Amino acid sequence: MATSAKRRTSKPVLAPIEAPVPKGKSQDYSVSGALMSEMPLWARPGYLLRRLHQIHYALFFEECAGFDITPVQYGLLTTLSTNPDLDQNSIARELGIDRTNVADVLGRLSRRGLIERRQGKVDKRTMLARLTPEGKRVTKEMYVSMQRAQERLLEPIPPAERHAFISTLIRLIDGNNHLGRTIFSPKEA
């Protein structure tokens, strides 16, 4: 269902940061470090992560255009495909997003017939969500397009370095997860 993506070729916008480092010293990327204080906006980690997030969204929407599903919605569908009958709080923890946002996403997906909600057996106040047959079909069909977006995002990184890149992102999240507005705590982590 994804449209064929036009691949743009462009020259690098940003050059790698290469500051002179005195012999026997390591680069200091701490906030108070000299190198960090001299970094322009486009070289700061937070700015770069935000920009990479924008690029990921653009790639996702380009590859998955025919499905009319957002990355957060696809994350929720994927979560329910491996963990059916989750309540709103569990979904929020799995995705690392706010409960209120989960309720909104569940409502949108329910109106499209991709998920269904039912009352919990143990706690009747709890509503559990699961994929409908149509939700399962869309989630499965979207996988190839989503995977293509991920591959395009990582394309500039040599294959031998991709694991290290992902590992570094995980370390940053693990080390700072407690500082987020919501806590990301997936079952499989």
Model regions and ranges:
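Short linear motifs centered on Gly/Pro in flexible linkers and helix caps
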Residues: 24, 97-100, 119
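A short alpha/beta connector and helix-capping loop motif
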Residues: 173-181
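Charged, amphipathic alpha-helical coiled-coil/dimerization segments
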Residues: 6, 57, 85, 107-174
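N-terminal helix-turn-helix DNA-binding core of bacterial DNA-binding proteins
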Residues: 40, 47-50, 54-101, 112, ...
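N-terminal leader segment of winged-helix/HTH proteins
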Residues: 1-67, 189
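Alpha-helix initiation/capping motif
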Residues: 34, 38, 42-45, 49, ...
